Amino acid sequence: MQPPGGDAPAGCPFSGARAAQPAQAPHEAPHVPGEADAQAGWHNAQLDFSKSMSYGDYLSLNSILDAQHPLSPDHNEMLFIIQHQTSELWMKLALFELRGALDAVRTDALPPAFKMLARVSRILEQLVQAWNVLSTMTPSEYSAMRPYLGQSSGFQSYQYRQLEFLLGNKNAQMLQPHAHRPDILEQVRATLEAPSFYDEVVRLLARRGFPIAAERLERDWTQPTRHDETVEAAWLEVYRHPQQHWELYEMAEELVDLEDAFRQWRFRHVTTVERIIGFKQGTGGTSGAPYLRKMLDVVLFPELWHVRTTL
Protein backbone atom coordinates (compact mmCIF):
# COMPACT_ATOMS: atom_id res chain seq x y z
CA MET A 1 0.00 0.00 0.00
CA GLN A 2 1.36 3.41 -1.00
CA PRO A 3 1.21 6.42 1.36
CA PRO A 4 -1.44 9.03 0.48
CA GLY A 5 -0.34 11.08 -2.49
CA GLY A 6 2.81 8.98 -2.91
CA ASP A 7 2.41 6.98 -6.08
CA ALA A 8 4.99 4.26 -6.71
CA PRO A 9 7.70 5.19 -9.25
CA ALA A 10 6.77 4.13 -12.76
CA GLY A 11 7.93 0.58 -13.40
CA CYS A 12 9.18 0.07 -9.82
CA PRO A 13 10.00 -3.67 -9.52
CA PHE A 14 8.87 -3.72 -5.88
CA SER A 15 5.44 -2.14 -6.42
CA GLY A 16 4.30 -4.45 -9.20
CA ALA A 17 2.83 -1.36 -10.88
CA ARG A 18 3.13 -0.81 -14.59
CA ALA A 19 4.37 2.52 -15.77
CA ALA A 20 1.49 4.83 -16.68
CA GLN A 21 1.25 5.37 -20.44
CA PRO A 22 0.09 8.70 -21.89
CA ALA A 23 -3.05 8.36 -23.98
CA GLN A 24 -2.45 8.57 -27.74
CA ALA A 25 -4.30 11.22 -29.65
CA PRO A 26 -6.64 9.69 -32.25
CA HIS A 27 -4.58 11.01 -35.15
CA GLU A 28 -1.25 9.66 -33.88
CA ALA A 29 0.26 6.59 -35.51
CA PRO A 30 1.18 3.66 -33.23
CA HIS A 31 4.68 3.97 -31.79
CA VAL A 32 7.27 1.67 -33.37
CA PRO A 33 10.39 0.95 -31.28
CA GLY A 34 13.51 2.07 -33.05
CA GLU A 35 16.89 3.66 -32.81
CA ALA A 36 15.62 6.72 -30.96
CA ASP A 37 14.38 4.51 -28.13
CA ALA A 38 17.73 2.77 -27.89
CA GLN A 39 19.45 6.12 -27.51
CA ALA A 40 16.99 7.74 -25.10
CA GLY A 41 16.08 4.69 -23.02
CA TRP A 42 12.77 2.92 -22.96
CA HIS A 43 10.28 5.47 -21.59
CA ASN A 44 13.22 7.33 -19.99
CA ALA A 45 14.21 4.24 -17.99
CA GLN A 46 17.89 3.80 -17.20
CA LEU A 47 19.23 0.92 -19.28
CA ASP A 48 22.98 1.14 -18.70
CA PHE A 49 24.10 -0.16 -15.31
CA SER A 50 27.80 -0.53 -16.06
CA LYS A 51 28.59 2.22 -13.54
CA SER A 52 25.66 2.03 -11.12
CA MET A 53 23.84 -0.46 -8.91
CA SER A 54 21.14 -2.51 -10.60
CA TYR A 55 18.16 -4.37 -9.17
CA GLY A 56 20.10 -7.64 -9.23
CA ASP A 57 23.13 -6.02 -7.60
CA TYR A 58 21.04 -4.59 -4.76
CA LEU A 59 19.38 -7.93 -4.03
CA SER A 60 22.55 -10.03 -4.50
CA LEU A 61 20.58 -12.17 -6.93
CA ASN A 62 23.65 -13.94 -8.26
CA SER A 63 24.33 -15.39 -4.80
CA ILE A 64 20.68 -16.23 -4.12
CA LEU A 65 19.92 -17.80 -7.50
CA ASP A 66 23.17 -19.78 -7.52
CA ALA A 67 22.42 -21.30 -4.09
CA GLN A 68 20.36 -24.25 -5.36
CA HIS A 69 22.44 -27.40 -5.75
CA PRO A 70 20.28 -30.51 -6.26
CA LEU A 71 22.02 -33.76 -5.36
CA SER A 72 19.67 -36.08 -7.20
CA PRO A 73 18.79 -36.29 -10.91
CA ASP A 74 15.12 -35.89 -9.99
CA HIS A 75 13.28 -32.87 -11.40
CA ASN A 76 11.31 -32.27 -8.18
CA GLU A 77 14.29 -31.67 -5.93
CA MET A 78 14.48 -28.05 -7.09
CA LEU A 79 11.01 -27.46 -5.64
CA PHE A 80 12.06 -29.03 -2.35
CA ILE A 81 15.18 -26.87 -2.09
CA ILE A 82 13.52 -23.58 -3.01
CA GLN A 83 10.59 -24.26 -0.68
CA HIS A 84 12.93 -24.57 2.27
CA GLN A 85 15.29 -21.77 1.26
CA THR A 86 12.46 -19.27 0.89
CA SER A 87 11.03 -20.40 4.21
CA GLU A 88 14.38 -19.68 5.83
CA LEU A 89 14.36 -16.17 4.33
CA TRP A 90 10.91 -15.50 5.75
CA MET A 91 12.02 -16.84 9.14
CA LYS A 92 15.00 -14.49 9.04
CA LEU A 93 12.59 -11.58 8.64
CA ALA A 94 10.28 -12.94 11.36
CA LEU A 95 13.21 -13.10 13.80
CA PHE A 96 14.31 -9.59 12.81
CA GLU A 97 10.82 -8.20 13.43
CA LEU A 98 10.30 -10.11 16.68
CA ARG A 99 13.59 -8.88 18.10
CA GLY A 100 12.72 -5.35 17.08
CA ALA A 101 9.35 -5.70 18.80
CA LEU A 102 11.05 -7.12 21.90
CA ASP A 103 13.37 -4.10 22.11
CA ALA A 104 10.35 -1.81 21.73
CA VAL A 105 8.46 -3.55 24.55
CA ARG A 106 11.45 -3.22 26.85
CA THR A 107 11.31 0.56 26.40
CA ASP A 108 7.48 0.73 26.57
CA ALA A 109 7.27 1.79 22.92
CA LEU A 110 4.22 -0.33 22.19
CA PRO A 111 2.80 1.14 18.93
CA PRO A 112 5.96 0.23 16.95
CA ALA A 113 5.87 -3.21 18.58
CA PHE A 114 2.29 -3.72 17.38
CA LYS A 115 3.33 -2.98 13.81
CA MET A 116 6.18 -5.48 13.98
CA LEU A 117 4.04 -8.19 15.55
CA ALA A 118 1.38 -7.74 12.87
CA ARG A 119 4.10 -8.18 10.27
CA VAL A 120 5.27 -11.42 11.89
CA SER A 121 1.71 -12.75 11.74
CA ARG A 122 1.56 -11.92 8.02
CA ILE A 123 4.91 -13.66 7.50
CA LEU A 124 3.52 -16.78 9.17
CA GLU A 125 0.50 -16.62 6.88
CA GLN A 126 2.89 -16.51 3.93
CA LEU A 127 4.65 -19.59 5.29
CA VAL A 128 1.30 -21.36 5.66
CA GLN A 129 0.50 -20.74 1.99
CA ALA A 130 3.92 -22.03 0.96
CA TRP A 131 2.91 -25.54 2.04
CA ASN A 132 0.39 -25.51 -0.83
CA VAL A 133 3.28 -25.42 -3.29
CA LEU A 134 5.25 -28.23 -1.64
CA SER A 135 2.11 -30.37 -1.45
CA THR A 136 2.15 -30.61 -5.25
CA MET A 137 4.97 -33.14 -4.74
CA THR A 138 3.61 -36.68 -4.73
CA PRO A 139 4.87 -39.57 -2.56
CA SER A 140 6.50 -41.17 -5.61
CA GLU A 141 8.32 -37.97 -6.49
CA TYR A 142 9.60 -37.47 -2.94
CA SER A 143 10.71 -41.09 -2.69
CA ALA A 144 12.91 -40.63 -5.76
CA MET A 145 14.95 -37.87 -4.11
CA ARG A 146 14.73 -38.78 -0.43
CA PRO A 147 17.83 -41.04 -0.37
CA TYR A 148 19.93 -38.03 -1.37
CA LEU A 149 18.88 -36.00 1.70
CA GLY A 150 20.91 -38.09 4.13
CA GLN A 151 20.15 -37.06 7.72
CA SER A 152 19.34 -33.44 6.86
CA SER A 153 15.95 -32.30 8.14
CA GLY A 154 13.99 -29.13 8.85
CA PHE A 155 14.20 -30.26 12.49
CA GLN A 156 17.78 -28.94 12.34
CA SER A 157 16.80 -25.41 11.22
CA TYR A 158 18.58 -23.09 13.63
CA GLN A 159 16.41 -20.14 12.66
CA TYR A 160 13.24 -22.11 13.38
CA ARG A 161 14.72 -23.17 16.70
CA GLN A 162 15.43 -19.56 17.60
CA LEU A 163 11.89 -18.64 16.61
CA GLU A 164 10.50 -21.32 18.94
CA PHE A 165 12.78 -20.15 21.76
CA LEU A 166 11.93 -16.49 21.22
CA LEU A 167 8.24 -17.37 21.46
CA GLY A 168 8.81 -19.27 24.71
CA ASN A 169 8.95 -22.94 23.70
CA LYS A 170 12.34 -23.61 25.29
CA ASN A 171 14.15 -26.96 25.31
CA ALA A 172 17.89 -27.14 26.00
CA GLN A 173 18.15 -30.51 24.23
CA MET A 174 17.47 -28.71 20.96
CA LEU A 175 20.96 -27.19 21.16
CA GLN A 176 22.56 -30.54 20.33
CA PRO A 177 21.88 -30.56 16.55
CA HIS A 178 24.00 -27.39 16.31
CA ALA A 179 26.98 -28.51 18.39
CA HIS A 180 29.06 -29.07 15.24
CA ARG A 181 28.78 -25.36 14.40
CA PRO A 182 30.07 -23.30 17.37
CA ASP A 183 29.04 -20.00 15.77
CA ILE A 184 25.45 -21.15 15.27
CA LEU A 185 25.36 -22.90 18.65
CA GLU A 186 26.27 -19.60 20.32
CA GLN A 187 23.36 -17.81 18.60
CA VAL A 188 20.81 -20.47 19.52
CA ARG A 189 22.09 -20.75 23.10
CA ALA A 190 21.85 -16.98 23.57
CA THR A 191 18.18 -17.10 22.53
CA LEU A 192 17.54 -20.04 24.87
CA GLU A 193 19.07 -18.25 27.86
CA ALA A 194 17.39 -14.88 27.31
CA PRO A 195 13.83 -13.94 28.30
CA SER A 196 11.31 -14.80 25.59
CA PHE A 197 9.11 -12.18 23.98
CA TYR A 198 6.23 -13.18 26.24
CA ASP A 199 8.49 -12.95 29.30
CA GLU A 200 9.11 -9.31 28.40
CA VAL A 201 5.38 -8.72 27.98
CA VAL A 202 4.80 -10.17 31.47
CA ARG A 203 7.40 -7.73 32.79
CA LEU A 204 5.48 -5.00 30.99
CA LEU A 205 2.35 -6.00 32.91
CA ALA A 206 4.30 -5.58 36.15
CA ARG A 207 5.57 -2.14 35.09
CA ARG A 208 1.95 -1.13 34.42
CA GLY A 209 1.09 -1.90 38.04
CA PHE A 210 -0.24 -5.45 37.92
CA PRO A 211 0.84 -7.68 40.86
CA ILE A 212 2.84 -10.35 39.03
CA ALA A 213 4.51 -13.00 41.21
CA ALA A 214 8.21 -12.32 41.77
CA GLU A 215 9.14 -15.87 40.75
CA ARG A 216 7.49 -15.24 37.38
CA LEU A 217 9.43 -12.04 36.77
CA GLU A 218 12.81 -13.60 37.54
CA ARG A 219 13.12 -17.27 36.69
CA ASP A 220 15.20 -19.78 34.77
CA TRP A 221 14.76 -18.44 31.24
CA THR A 222 15.86 -21.73 29.70
CA GLN A 223 12.57 -23.30 30.81
CA PRO A 224 9.41 -23.14 28.67
CA THR A 225 6.55 -20.81 29.50
CA ARG A 226 4.24 -22.18 32.20
CA HIS A 227 0.79 -20.97 33.19
CA ASP A 228 0.88 -18.46 36.05
CA GLU A 229 -2.21 -17.41 38.01
CA THR A 230 -1.00 -13.86 38.61
CA VAL A 231 -0.40 -13.35 34.90
CA GLU A 232 -3.87 -14.64 34.05
CA ALA A 233 -5.39 -12.36 36.69
CA ALA A 234 -3.66 -9.40 35.04
CA TRP A 235 -4.98 -10.33 31.59
CA LEU A 236 -8.45 -10.84 33.05
CA GLU A 237 -8.42 -7.26 34.30
CA VAL A 238 -7.21 -6.05 30.90
CA TYR A 239 -9.97 -7.91 29.05
CA ARG A 240 -12.69 -6.80 31.46
CA HIS A 241 -11.68 -3.14 31.15
CA PRO A 242 -10.07 -2.77 27.71
CA GLN A 243 -10.66 0.99 27.52
CA GLN A 244 -8.59 1.50 30.67
CA HIS A 245 -5.75 -0.71 29.44
CA TRP A 246 -6.00 -0.27 25.69
CA GLU A 247 -2.32 -0.78 24.84
CA LEU A 248 -2.15 -3.98 26.87
CA TYR A 249 -5.44 -5.12 25.33
CA GLU A 250 -4.02 -4.55 21.86
CA MET A 251 -0.81 -6.36 22.82
CA ALA A 252 -2.82 -9.35 24.00
CA GLU A 253 -4.73 -9.55 20.73
CA GLU A 254 -1.55 -9.19 18.65
CA LEU A 255 -0.08 -12.14 20.54
CA VAL A 256 -3.20 -14.23 20.01
CA ASP A 257 -3.09 -13.40 16.29
CA LEU A 258 0.55 -14.46 16.18
CA GLU A 259 0.00 -17.77 17.95
CA ASP A 260 -3.07 -18.47 15.84
CA ALA A 261 -0.98 -18.03 12.68
CA PHE A 262 1.82 -20.17 14.15
CA ARG A 263 -0.64 -22.97 14.93
CA GLN A 264 -1.92 -22.88 11.37
CA TRP A 265 1.66 -23.17 10.09
CA ARG A 266 2.26 -26.20 12.32
CA PHE A 267 -0.98 -27.83 11.20
CA ARG A 268 -0.21 -27.38 7.50
CA HIS A 269 3.25 -28.80 8.18
CA VAL A 270 1.70 -31.95 9.62
CA THR A 271 -0.81 -32.43 6.83
CA THR A 272 1.79 -31.82 4.13
CA VAL A 273 4.12 -34.40 5.69
CA GLU A 274 1.29 -36.94 6.00
CA ARG A 275 0.30 -36.31 2.40
CA ILE A 276 3.81 -36.81 1.03
CA ILE A 277 5.51 -39.39 3.28
CA GLY A 278 2.66 -40.76 5.38
CA PHE A 279 3.88 -41.95 8.77
CA LYS A 280 7.46 -42.82 7.87
CA GLN A 281 10.27 -41.76 10.17
CA GLY A 282 11.64 -38.31 9.40
CA THR A 283 15.07 -37.93 7.79
CA GLY A 284 16.31 -36.27 10.99
CA GLY A 285 15.38 -39.31 13.10
CA THR A 286 12.08 -38.10 14.59
CA SER A 287 8.87 -40.11 14.28
CA GLY A 288 7.80 -37.72 11.52
CA ALA A 289 4.09 -36.89 11.45
CA PRO A 290 3.39 -38.21 15.00
CA TYR A 291 6.12 -35.89 16.35
CA LEU A 292 4.66 -32.94 14.46
CA ARG A 293 1.16 -33.74 15.74
CA LYS A 294 2.47 -33.68 19.29
CA MET A 295 3.83 -30.18 18.65
CA LEU A 296 0.29 -29.02 17.87
CA ASP A 297 -0.44 -29.24 21.60
CA VAL A 298 2.25 -26.69 22.53
CA VAL A 299 0.71 -23.45 23.83
CA LEU A 300 2.96 -20.40 23.65
CA PHE A 301 0.91 -17.86 25.62
CA PRO A 302 -1.20 -20.02 27.97
CA GLU A 303 -2.87 -17.30 30.05
CA LEU A 304 -4.15 -15.49 26.96
CA TRP A 305 -6.04 -18.60 25.89
CA HIS A 306 -7.25 -19.68 29.32
CA VAL A 307 -8.56 -16.22 30.21
CA ARG A 308 -11.17 -16.59 27.47
CA THR A 309 -12.83 -19.32 29.51
CA THR A 310 -12.67 -17.22 32.67
CA LEU A 311 -14.28 -14.13 31.16
UniProtKB/Swiss-Prot annotation:
Q: Which keywords are on file for this protein?
A: Dioxygenase, Heme, Iron, Metal-binding, Oxidoreductase, Tryptophan catabolism
Which SUPFAM superfamilies does this UniProt record tie to the protein? Answer: Indolic compounds 2,3-dioxygenase-like (SSF140959)
Where on this chain does heme bind?
H269
Heme as a keyword? yes
Q: What would you give as a GO molecular function for this chain, any one?
A: tryptophan 2,3-dioxygenase activity
Provide the catalytic activity annotation: L-tryptophan + O2 = N-formyl-L-kynurenine
Which cofactors does it use?
heme
**Cited Pfam families:** Trp_dioxygenase
Description of how the protein assembles with itself and partners: Homotetramer.
Q: What is this protein called?
A: Tryptophan 2,3-dioxygenase
